[in-house]
Amino acid sequence: CRLDGRGMEENDFEERHFTEAERAQAEITESGNPRKPEGEDGKKMLERMNESHHNVTGWALSLWEIQGNDNILDIGCGGGAALSRMAEHVTDGHLTGIDYSSVSVETSRATNAESVAAGKMEILEGSVENLPFEAETFDKIVTVESFYFWPNPQENLKEVRRVLKTGGTFLL
């Protein structure tokens, strides 16, 4: 695209070759609002997000030493894939997911139905702006591919710090 005021010509563009990840991202955004998935399109979007975030989530979680008795919060839990992966390691602890999309909460609960039914996990509808937990509740807090959706990052990080135990770990 020219910025010199002469307009655009066909020769100004070259054919673009998209990677699989770029195509997946384009499909996500064409199907609705990734910030707050809604309706049937939102459910499909969450399924694709679970798939497209798989590798980065695995890498990020590999940086943590998850203990069996950890109490972990996943902010912006989306379709619940990260919670599911952490549930493999948390045996005596507890996992909590929170998302402000009701479709995300519903999908995450379905993805993790066994852990939810066993009382090992709960998934709540809520916002990072006002986390419904006591101070110093969680050993670890994670957010996967959702920080850029937070409405007021500086204030929201203070809220994360409030519910994170002293010496706890926040994985962003």
What are these regions (language model features)?
Residues 41-61:
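Conserved SAM-binding loop and adjacent beta-strand
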Residues 79-91:
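Conserved SAM-binding loop of SAM-dependent methyltransferases across substrates and taxa
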Residues 101-103:
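Conserved SAM/SAH-binding beta-strand->alpha-helix loop
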Residues 108-109:
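Conserved SAM-binding loop
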Residues 117-129:
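Conserved SAM-binding strand-loop segment of SAM-dependent methyltransferases
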Residues 129-141:
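A short acidic, Gly/Pro-enriched loop at the edge of an enzyme's catalytic core
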Residues 140-152:
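A short SAM/SAH-binding and catalytic strip from SAM-dependent methyltransferases
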Residues 154-166:
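A short glycine-rich, Lys/Arg-flanked "PGG" loop and its adjoining helix->strand segment in the class I
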